[in-house]
Amino acid sequence: MLDSKDLLYPAKWLSKASTGVRVAYELRMRIVSGLIESGTILSENTIAAEFSVSRSPVREALKILASEKIIRLERMGAVVIGLTEKKIAEIYDVRLLLETFVFERLVKIDIEPLVKDLSKILEMMKVSIKYEDADEFSFQDVLFHETIIRAIDHSYIQMIWNNLKPVMESFILLSMRVRLKEKYEDFTRILDNHELYIQAIKTKDRALMIQSLHQNFDDVQDKVEDLWLSQQMLAKGAEYNND
């Protein structure tokens, strides 16, 4: 495999992953960032040579990415589809549906352990910003929402989340790297939104939860064509890696 400093995806997050999975994560980051452009044909031999691996893990990686619909497997090789603004918006559509459903279940259960867990994660997010660690902030941000999803113990909701997570995580990583360098003040808004989430769950207040969800997701939807969600922004996220 490539040296960790040459990778876009944080290598420490994949210490126990198979070679194929690690190749998939790196290729995904390159595709989402636009470093590998839509329409590019990926060759098993070329990828294997670049990553210093055999073709078997490369095939595994390409199958993973094909299942996520960001590449298409054809006879001549794997054709990159990429991540469009429409796809980003659709990911957030599904997240809004998921988290709205989950909240309806949360009001029926004991949420004290969940509130404690979310409060801890939020503190870690604050520490990450204090030390200007965009990658750790991204990890904690995804973990925050995943912890909410897991709290209702719903296997099919979890399955949908697991399918969304890889591409969504790549997008979040790249966008947070740019925010840290160019729009640091925006983290205050993000942290405030997460505080609102916790308060809504703690009080089981549906109106507050709807407010917190829409504050988070409508902000994204309204800006789908803006710099933060454009290919230019994602490419910048790749440039800012390991700065």
Curated annotation (Swiss-Prot):
- SUPFAM superfamilies linked to this entry: GntR ligand-binding domain-like (SSF48008), Winged helix' DNA-binding domain (SSF46785)
- Domain of life of the source: Bacteria
Please name the PROSITE patterns in this protein's record: HTH_GNTR (PS50949)
Keyword annotations for this protein? Answer: DNA-binding, Gluconate utilization, Repressor, Transcription, Transcription regulation
Q: Which GO terms describe its molecular function?
A: DNA binding; DNA-binding transcription factor activity
Q: In what residue span(s) does the HTH gntR-type domain sit?
A: 17-83
DNA-binding region ranges: 44-63
Gene3D superfamilies associated with the record: GntR ligand-binding domain-like, Winged helix-like DNA-binding domain superfamily/Winged helix DNA-binding domain
Which GO biological process annotations does it have? D-gluconate metabolic process
Function of the molecule? Transcriptional repressor of the gluconate operon (gntRKPZ), which encodes the proteins for gluconate utilization. Represses mRNA synthesis by binding to the gnt operator; the binding is suppressed by gluconate or glucono-delta-lactone.
In Swiss-Prot or TrEMBL terms, this protein is called Gluconate operon transcriptional repressor
> From which source organism is this entry?
Bacillus subtilis (strain 168)
The gene name on file is gntR
